[in-house]
């Protein structure tokens, strides 16, 4: 049965896992790491870079590198320009997903077509649909979108499903924060409530350090560095490193030599100490925001901290001591430590993929919608149909009527949010139901139905009960992608994949050619009288032809000239191999061995060189 991936598409890092032998296993990327930086860039030669390679070149190439694109998912008009071309957040996210997919395929040795992808619990409809679009562009059928804290609870509780317990999942990632309250028991994972902030995460803690460094440098040197992209990239890396170091030590030093040049032409260096106490002071308001969300989630679930059986921390930012201390003080419980905060979400997604694929039995996941859904009614009021923290999938209907006599049509304005005034909530979509027969206001009966699927994505319909006329909309949201746009982006992504494949193939052809030239030159040198002058002349001519081809860009020409060189050198290498064999067979004792030592080892080396094994590895 085809494998279904579980993917944690993170703000800072992403992770992919799969079910193998009844267990969820994290798949390492091509570089050998278990997580992949969610960074996309283009090199100065126009080559697409994703992951660690993109992150490494960011300091020298900040204009063509993008971080934290997840923070802009679902934004209508947001674009980033890389290598002279505009990309939507969905397209950038698709590049990350393509990298994860390709690495998983290489690891598993099979083609992957389906995935379960996680999103922050507090992602709205627009952001969820954008995530599905990104999966489609990457060539993945997204079977399910699930919430990150819920996925983490699956990772924690798959082997504890028979124990009734209430757990709090505190998920502080690179760019988003969620807290969810769940009840586990009898194989059922039921989300009772969720709260959070889609623009609060480790990036914000880093930014506080960056702001501090900028202010300190301006104070000491009188230079404003805030407009220099290359410098800001160095500061970003230094701030992230300092944050991580302060999780283990009480103070750290930020030393960045040759950061800029002063008005006197002299280089300026940064050398600033930062203590854990200073760091915690400058970020305490960020932690306070997470406390507000924890209180709200418990209140919505009608629980107190004393009712909790377990507290789970998820996301790399939860390694900060201040986070652990805050959660422990609030809940009165030491957080559960036997779970990797960077991998738990991907593992949970893989378990859900196993449920959908029939590999994992007796597990039922009951998630909730994070925000209230409703429509605008008379006077600009937001009238809710589905309250936040309602278990999904769900379907709710309500009867509305006209606001004026003989009103021929009604506009259904679909909203998401907690405010009582329509304009203060997020618009998900609008559509018109027309053809209503003339009647006094309040007489026509318009049934509005909201239907949320298991991915948390909304479908809305309106029906005139008098005429039976109906209109419906699958919320595509502002900034959503039409099927045609997704199709175009899929083709564009496939085209880039083909370009990447060709570029890689061309590099391999060049590497093979250069390695063969080295091996052939050594073979000629070592052959001695085993090669005729005519044979040597042919090999030398083939070497020159191949070197000339390497000066150009015609890969097929290089390939053909490589094959020609292989053919010309083959008789010589064969003769050398046979000579080496004969010498080995003739060695009958110490004297015989001494007589062949001078030539035998050399011939062995030449033969190995001709196979080009070592040279290819070096390339």
From Swiss-Prot:
It holds the Pfam family HSP70. Keywords: ATP-binding, Chaperone, Nucleotide-binding. CDD domains: ASKHA_NBD_HSP70_DnaK-like (cd10234). Residues 580-619 are annotated as: Disordered. Residues 604-619 have a biased composition (Acidic residues). One of its GO terms (molecular function) is ATP-dependent protein folding chaperone. Signal peptide: none annotated. Acts as a chaperone. Belongs to the heat shock protein 70 family. This is Chaperone protein DnaK.
């Amino acid at each position: 049965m085809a494998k279904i991936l579980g993917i944690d598409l993170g703000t800072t890092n992403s992770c992919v896992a799969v079910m193998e032998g009844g267990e969820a296993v994290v798949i390492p990327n091509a570089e050998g790491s278990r997580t992949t930086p969610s960074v996309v860039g283009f090199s100065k030669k126009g080559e697409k870079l994703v992951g660690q390679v993109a992150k490494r070149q960011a300091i020298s190439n900040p204009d063509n590198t993008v971080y934290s694109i997840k923070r802009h998912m679902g934004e209508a008009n947001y674009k980033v320009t890389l290598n002279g071309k505009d990309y939507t957040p969905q397209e950038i996210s698709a590049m990350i997903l393509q990298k994860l997919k390709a690495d998983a395929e290489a690891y598993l040795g099979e083609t992957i077509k389906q995935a379960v992808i996680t999103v922050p619990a507090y992602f709205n409809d627009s952001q969820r649909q954008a995530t599905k679009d990104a999966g489609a562009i990457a060539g993945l059928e997204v079977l399910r979108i699930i919430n990150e804290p819920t996925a983490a609870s699956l990772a924690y509780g798959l082997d504890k499903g028979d124990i009734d317990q209430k757990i709090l999942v505190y998920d502080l990632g690179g760019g988003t924060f969620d807290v969810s309250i769940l009840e586990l028991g009898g194989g059922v994972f039921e989300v009772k409530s969720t709260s959070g902030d889609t623009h609060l995460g480790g990036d914000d803690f880093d930014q506080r350090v960056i702001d501090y460094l900028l202010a300190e440098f301006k104070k000491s040197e009188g230079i404003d560095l805030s407009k220099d992209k290359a410098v800001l990239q160095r500061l970003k890396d230094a701030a992230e490193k300092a944050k991580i170091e302060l999780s283990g030590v009480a103070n750290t030093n930020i030393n960045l030599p040759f950061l800029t040049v002063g008005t006197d032409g002299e280089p300026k260096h940064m050398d600033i100490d930062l203590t854990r106490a200073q760091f915690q002071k400058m970020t305490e308001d960020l932690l306070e925001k997470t406390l507000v969300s924890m209180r709200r989630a418990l209140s919505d679930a009608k629980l107190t901290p004393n009712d909790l059986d377990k507290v789970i921390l998820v996301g790399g930012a939860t390694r900060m001591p201040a986070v652990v201390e805050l959660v422990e003080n609030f809940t009165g419980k030491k957080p559960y430590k036997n779970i990797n905060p960077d991998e738990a979400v991907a593992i949970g997604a893989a378990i859900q993929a196993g449920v959908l694929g029939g590999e994992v039995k007796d597990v039922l996941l009951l998630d909730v919608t994070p925000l209230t859904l409703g429509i605008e009614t008379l006077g600009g009021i937001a009238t809710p149909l589905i309250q936040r923290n309602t278990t999904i999938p769900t379907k709710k209907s309500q009867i509305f009527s006209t606001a004026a006599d003989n009103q021929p049509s009604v506009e259904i304005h679909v909203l998401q949010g907690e405010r009582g005034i329509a304009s203060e909530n997020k618009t998900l979509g609008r559509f018109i139901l027309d053809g209503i027969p003339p009647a006094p206001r309040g007489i026509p009966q318009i049934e509005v139905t909201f239907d949320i699927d298991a991915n948390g994505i909304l479908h809305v319909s309106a029906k005139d009960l008098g005429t039976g006329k109906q209109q419906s909309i699958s919320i595509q949201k502002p900034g959503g992608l039409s099927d045609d746009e997704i199709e175009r982006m899929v083709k564009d992504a496939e085209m880039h994949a083909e370009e990447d494949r060709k570029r890689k193939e061309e590099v391999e052809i060049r590497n093979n050619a250069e390695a063969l030239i080295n091996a052939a030159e050594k073979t000629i040198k070592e052959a001695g009288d085993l090669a005729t002058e005519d044979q040597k002349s042919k090999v030398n001519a083939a070497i020159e032809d191949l070197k000339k081809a390497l000066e150009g860009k015609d890969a097929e020409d290089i390939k053909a000239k490589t094959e020609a060189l292989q053919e010309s050198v083959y008789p010589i290498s064969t003769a050398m191999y046979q000579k080496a064999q004969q010498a080995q067979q003739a060695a009958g004792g110490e004297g015989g061995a001494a007589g062949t030592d001078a030539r035998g080892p050399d011939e062995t080396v030449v033969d190995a060189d001709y196979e080009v094994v070592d040279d290819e590895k070096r390339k």
